[in-house]
């Protein structure tokens, strides 16, 4: 804990509040994964749990899933300490071309395999932590140490100030076209093209491609057999591949984070200080953002759009303050709620309508089921 608080990015520690308290308890309890969490051996043998036995109303929980289906979800999986508490799948009617672009196939149970869009960023954040743990990088290294000069459209001097930490925190100071916008660390801007350079660094230091390193470091240990990086022929080269997976396999990833970086008895990522930093405010410009993860319970948040619009209050007001999330286009979601022992995954088409986004529609319904 002392090591974590000493990190320079946590000079804003007063804003962390319940998120840090819950996650610190979760991540420091190394016995939690061994004693309290269940890890499925395979999809064929994934235990379920009766919601009523762990404080949830079955009828109201079903109503929350009904709502998710009405909001164009293709799949929702809710885990309680690793066991499936609720799960449902839908066949989308008249899916948009955009959804069809993200649909990569189906598993043997006919469950959708989908490119999770920007939810992949949170997977890359974990890969960066593993690379640092293995001594391949330091997130405080300059990007140019690994990619040389000229990787952006900023001047050499401006570019030299940008670190991997800046890319993980979305405060590189680069505009979406990779030109200089502000000094590194001086402004927060959700910048997908800049983020993609994190993976380029990881491929460089690992000496292999993204599929191989992701398989070795994450998906193979977790049994995520349908998960891989897939090409996006419809996209610009800067975002030309996406992480594709199923709702169940994304839930496996969330369960590993819930277990503090462990899967069964295997340490996937052992650096608890990095995990705590990843799931806590990475800077003061947008306290609702960690290292490529979204964080609830903060004073305000900045949006992912080009204008980075400020919204006062929690990211998801109806959800517990300690929620952290992976979020992507078409409302791809993974929510982790330490205080409720939940991992919640949602895939599908855009679930936001009538000026109400999916988060603000789904979470009041889900929390109504809590007894």
Which residues are covered by each model-predicted region?
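Active-site SXXK
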Residues: 82, 101-103, 110-139, 198-203, ...
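A short, well-structured edge-of-sheet supersecondary motif
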Residues: 66-104, 334-336, 341-345
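Active-site Gly/Thr loop motif
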Residues: 226, 280-343
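A short, polar/charged loop-to-alpha-helix boundary motif
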Residues: 93-109, 353-361
């Amino acid at each position: 804990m002392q090591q974590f608080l000493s990190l320079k990015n946590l000079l804003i520690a007063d804003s962390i509040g319940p998120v840090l308290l819950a996650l610190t308890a979760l991540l420091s309890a190394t016995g939690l994964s061994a004693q309290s969490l269940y890890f499925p051996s395979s999809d064929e043998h994934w235990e379920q749990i009766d919601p009523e036995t762990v404080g949830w109303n079955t009828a109201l929980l079903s109503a929350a899933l009904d709502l998710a289906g009405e909001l164009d979800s293709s799949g929702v999986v809710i885990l309680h300490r690793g066991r499936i508490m609720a799960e449902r799948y839908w066949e989308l009617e008249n899916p948009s071309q955009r959804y069809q672009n993200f649909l990569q196939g189906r598993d043997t149970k006919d469950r959708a395999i989908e490119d999770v869009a920007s939810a992949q960023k949170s997977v890359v954040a974990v890969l960066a932590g593993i690379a640092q743990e293995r001594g391949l990088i330091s997130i405080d290294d300059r990007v140019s140490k690994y990619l040389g000069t000229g990787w952006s459209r900023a001047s050499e001097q401006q570019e030299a100030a940008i670190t991997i930490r800046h890319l993980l925190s979305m405060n590189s100071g680069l505009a979406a076209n990779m030109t200089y916008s502000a000094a590194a660390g001086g402004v927060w801007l959700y910048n997908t093209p800049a983020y993609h350079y994190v993976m380029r660094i990881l491929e460089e230091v690992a000496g292999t491609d993204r599929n191989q390193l992701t398989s070795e470091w994450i998906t193979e240990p977790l049994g995520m057999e349908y998960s891989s990086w897939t090409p996006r022929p419809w996209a610009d080269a800067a975002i030309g591949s996406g992480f594709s997976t199923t709702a169940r396999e994304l839930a496996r990833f969330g369960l590993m984070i819930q277990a503090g970086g462990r899967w069964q008895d295997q340490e996937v990522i052992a650096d608890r200080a990095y995990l705590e930093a990843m799931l806590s405010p990475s800077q003061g410009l947008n306290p609702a953002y960690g290292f490529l993860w979204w964080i609830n319970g903060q004073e305000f948040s900045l949006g992912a759009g080009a204008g980075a619009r400020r919204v006062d209050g929690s990211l998801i007001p109806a959800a517990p303050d300690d929620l952290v999330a992976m979020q992507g286009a078409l409302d791809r979601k993974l929510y982790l709620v330490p205080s409720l022992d939940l991992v919640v995954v949602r895939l599908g088409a855009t679930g936001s309508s009538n000026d109400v986004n999916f988060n603000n529609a789904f979470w009041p319904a889900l929390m109504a089921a809590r007894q």
